[in-house]
Amino acid sequence: MSLPRRALIAVTSAHAELFEGGGHTTGVFIGEALHPYNVFKAAGFEVDIASEEGTWTEDWLSLQPGFLSPEEREQYDDRSSEFRREMDANVKAADVLNKDVSVQRLHGIDFPHADRD
């Protein structure tokens, strides 16, 4: 039996302040979802994107110059691109639990002051 050509990219539903008092939000670091998405698609995989709540927000810092190439930024900004349609159709992780996947990629959020006990 061969493995399914399906990948799951799990992103965060977090929407929090990036820097204390900075006014910018954290969430999905776009390159961390876009880069593997492009690799999986180029390898012929179907790709699902899911999050805890079926929602997402972009990390402000991830859209600043230097984090995405001009081509990647164009792909992200184009709401009709496959990547952006998949991001915007983001479903709850619980809704994809029964799908057979051969690759999983998780992108979370780090809270530096979180209680780690």
Where are these regions (language model features)?
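Extended, subdomain-level signal for the structured scaffold at the beginning of enzyme domains
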Residues: 1-117
